[in-house]
UniProtKB/Swiss-Prot annotation:
It is found in: Cell inner membrane. The gene is lnt. CDD domains: ALP_N-acyl_transferase. Keywords: Acyltransferase, Cell inner membrane, Cell membrane, Membrane, Transferase, Transmembrane, Transmembrane helix. It is a multi-pass membrane protein. The lineage of its organism: Bacteria, Pseudomonadati, Pseudomonadota, Gammaproteobacteria, Methylococcales. Belongs to the CN hydrolase family. Apolipoprotein N-acyltransferase subfamily. GO terms for biological process: lipoprotein biosynthetic process. This is Apolipoprotein N-acyltransferase.
Length: 504
């Protein structure tokens, strides 16, 4: 029972390492609690402890799913609570798998298990969670370190590299607690090496400025989600963004949020967007507009970002939100959603590789909504893309943890790629992030705001931009695989000796 409580407590604590709280030290302490109960557990017990940890981690950390479904998604309280509980129960399977893998593969000393096997198993299952069934890489532990020295690893090995070092640090802290004086000295020295050594990467300038800084304006309309799609509000909403844009012709680039236009592009092109584009060209300004886009051929709907200005272009969202923008396993699940009276949009995913949008004289890497939480997907436009743009509408989640957690992920994308991130949202967090992942300017949440600041286009490539997630994932998968093979070989050898004649 004590081990179960420790595991659950560790999971409950972990979300406080992330935004909006930012108690980064909680992350290694939380993992250290989990590793402690795994040390003396069987594989099945370790899976149970991992599952309890996951229930605490996601039950607190993604509680905003209920807010989205109940307050803004049209679900009744019981359906929203039930589906949120099912989602948390599913996510908790991944820490459970990490426990099973870590103990199954992790024979040997405390140091071998806490420094090699457990951290590697944790990272592998985090990666799996971010890939399986379209992926949900939320609350990956590396994000908790966006304001610590470990962040310096991100341009080299990405968020998984940061997460792996963090898990190793948790193992070192646990070893310092459990081992004798000699082992404790080794563990503390190792922790110092990790903390000090990782900061040395901050001295390397992986990317460099390309041209002069550019004045940009990010529009935050603060349109309430329950009013956004009302037909009678369409004209008022679009006119508001047009008026805000006209007040900032002194900027080189102006960005509207995701689906800032609550109508299809074709419905507002002539009445609003074409005249605005003509004005933008006269002033030498480019405007990026978030708008749904309809293609009659094939009857397809896209979540799009459209460029108005010198070089018109379109970007169609590639990574759609399951159950929000498309329905997986439609023949089975459509019936369930009908019973629960949950409305669902049905968009088409854009092509994996699309021509980069051009704005303010440079190619950019666009992402819409939660596409920016997938680090690997931000790399498809590098090194050509000079800066990152993310447009989103986190009004779906109200004043919950979600907008702050999402902002933290955008900061990691800037850090990994060595590029500025321009982030325009409906209600927040809207801001400019520099190439080192540091906020330059941030608009207050839940206010109508036009945030103006300077953005520096960048050139060059970080190691992560060249390699992606594969070195970190390959290392961790290799550790788990080698330890598995070694333990099986030792078990087979032991059985063989027992079977030899003459042995008692």
């Amino acid at each position: 029972m004590k081990a179960m409580l420790l595991a659950l407590t560790g999971g409950i604590l972990l979300p406080f390492a992330f935004a909006p709280f930012g108690y980064a030290l909680v992350a290694p302490l939380s993992l250290a609690l989990l590793f402690r109960v795994w040390l003396n557990a069987s594989p099945s017990k370790a899976a149970l402890y991992g599952y309890l940890f996951g229930l605490g981690q996601f039950g607190i950390g993604v509680s905003w799913v209920f807010v989205s479904m109940y307050e803004y998604g049209g679900s009744d309280v019981f359906s929203a609570a039930g589906l949120t509980a099912l989602f948390v129960a599913y996510l908790a399977l991944f820490p459970a798998l990490a426990g099973w893998l870590g103990v199954k593969a992790g024979g040997g000393s405390i140091l071998v298990r806490t420094l090699l096997v457990f951290p590697a198993a944790w990272v592998v299952t985090e990666w799996l969670r971010g890939w399986l069934f379209s992926g949900f890489p939320w609350l990956q532990i590396g994000y908790s370190q966006t304001d610590t020295g470990l962040r310096s690893i991100a341009p080299v090995f990405g968020v998984f590299g940061v997460g792996w070092l963090l898990a190793v640090l948790a193992g070192l802290l646990l070893s310092a607690w459990l081992l004798d004086r000699r082992g404790r000295r080794f563990a503390l020295l190792g922790a110092a090496v990790v903390l000090v050594g990782s900061t040395q990467f901050a001295k390397v300038q992986w990317t460099h400025p390309a041209g002069d800084p550019i004045r940009v304006t990010l529009l935050q309309g603060n349109v309430p989600q329950d009013q956004k799609w009302r037909p009678e509000a369409k004209t008022t909403t679009v006119q508001m963004y047009v008026d805000m844009t006209r007040q900032h012709w002194d900027s080189r680039l102006i960005i509207w949020p995701e689906t800032a236009v609550p109508a299809f592009y074709q419905q507002v092109a002539e009445s609003f967007l074409a005249p605005l584009e003509a004005e933008a060209r006269q002033h030498g300004v480019d405007v990026l507009v978030g708008v749904p886009y309809y293609e009659a051929q094939g009857n397809r709907y896209y979540n799009a970002l459209v460029t108005l200005g010198a070089k018109p272009g379109r970007y169609f969202k590639r990574h759609l939100v399951p159950f929000g923008e498309f329905l997986p396993l439609r023949p089975v699940l459509a019936f369930v959603l009908d019973i629960l009276q949950i409305p669902l949009a049905d968009f088409t995913a854009g092509a994996h590789r699309q021509t980069l949008l051009q704005a303010a004289g440079y190619p950019l890497i666009a992402s819409i909504c939660y596409e920016d939480i997938f680090g690997q997907e931000s790399l498809t436009g590098l090194p050509e893309g000079a800066y990152l743009v993310n447009v989103t509408n986190d009004a779906w989640f109200g004043d919950s943890f979600a907008p702050h957690q999402h902002w933290q992920k955008a900061r990691m994308r800037a850090l990994e790629t060595g590029r500025y991130m321009l982030r325009a949202t409906n209600t927040g967090v809207t801001g400019i992030i520099d190439a080192g992942g540091r906020p330059v300017a941030v608009a207050p949440m839940f206010e109508r705001e036009a945030l103006t600041g300077m953005m520096q286009p960048m050139a060059g490539a970080t190691p992560y931009a060249l390699w992606g997630d594969w070195p970190a994932i390959g290392l961790c998968a290799g550790i788990v695989g080698i330890c598995f093979a070694r333990r099986r070989r030792n078990a087979s050898s032991h059985q063989g000796r027992q079977a030899e004649p003459g042995r008692n």
